[in-house]
A protein has these predicted regions:
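Short, hydrophobic alpha-helical packing/hinge segments within bilobed ligand-binding/sensory domains
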Residues: 44-45, 74
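Juxtamembrane C-terminal module of membrane proteins
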Residues: 94-110, 134-229
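Catalytic donor-sugar/metal-binding loop of nucleotide-sugar-dependent glycosyltransferases
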Residues: 45-64
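Transmembrane alpha-helical segments and their cytosolic interface motifs
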Residues: 109-127
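Active-site-adjacent helix/loop segment of glycosyltransferases
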Residues: 69, 75-113
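Long helical/loop segments within the catalytic core of UDP-sugar-dependent glycosyltransferases
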Residues: 1-38, 79, 86, 90
């Protein structure tokens, strides 16, 4: 969805670690592979966007991504991603902002992608919590503060639910799972995404190192000709 929209707007896409292709020229001009932050795919993308390269997508490409086996592994993976975004922004943030000031939409887009969105969300929640605490101490405006906090949380959850619903609806036939699971997972998707908040906050202070993520896939659950052959 993100890269498709970027491609249609003439902006640069971003590569994903699941799979991407680049020419020997790109590797030669970079003097070999020199991207070793925790999210090296995003680092690779931003490095070349800053050099004026445009990353495109192949609409017909099909990539199979193995997911973490359990919630604990998912937390470990997302903690690495969150820390990686911080690392990338620390290294390339100033150049991205300069590119944005020069009118580069791709630089602006990448800035908004790696600037931890949780910071804005956390600031909004923190402001509402602070207002609630002050109201409780002063004894006035408590319900106003609580309503503001609930509205903030409600808008976040509603937005995530809509995004998840659109994705599942448009990819319904490609998601090989019972209908009830698709619906249940769509409804619980906002709650899953909220777990990014503590994960991302932890990434600000924790020392995060790369650790293997356990993946597994049951081929019999993927009824496709490619698997059968």
């Amino acid at each position: 969805y993100l890269n498709g929209a970027r491609n249609r707007l003439g902006s640069s896409a971003a590569v994903g670690g699941t799979g991407f292709l680049f020419s020997q020229r790109i590797l030669d001009e970079s003097h070999g592979w020199r991207f070793y932050l925790l999210t090296e795919d995003i680092e690779f993308s931003i490095h070349h966007i800053l050099r004026g390269e445009r990353i495109a997508i192949c609409e017909d490409a099909v990539l199979y991504d193995e997911q973490p086996t359990d919630f604990r592994q998912s937390v470990r993976q997302r903690l690495r991603w969150a820390k990686g975004y911080i690392q990338v922004f620390r290294r390339y943030g100033a150049d991205l902002l300069k590119g944005t000031a020069r009118g580069s939409w791709s630089c602006f887009d990448m800035s908004m992608s790696i600037l931890p969105a949780f910071i804005l969300t956390a600031l909004g929640l923190l402001a509402n919590l602070t207002l609630t605490a002050l109201s409780l101490m002063q004894g006035d405006g408590v319900w106003f503060a609580l309503r503001s906090l609930l509205e903030c949380m409600g808008s976040i959850l509603a937005t995530l639910l809509v995004l998840g619903g659109i994705t599942v609806a448009s990819e319904w036939r490609r998601i090989h799972a019972p209908a009830w699971k698709k619906i249940a997972f769509t409804l619980t998707f906002p709650l899953f995404m909220l777990t990014y908040l503590p994960i991302s906050m932890a990434a600000l202070f924790m020392k995060v190192e790369w650790k293997p993520i356990h993946h597994s896939v049951n081929l019999t659950s993927l009824p496709s000709p490619a698997v059968k052959n």
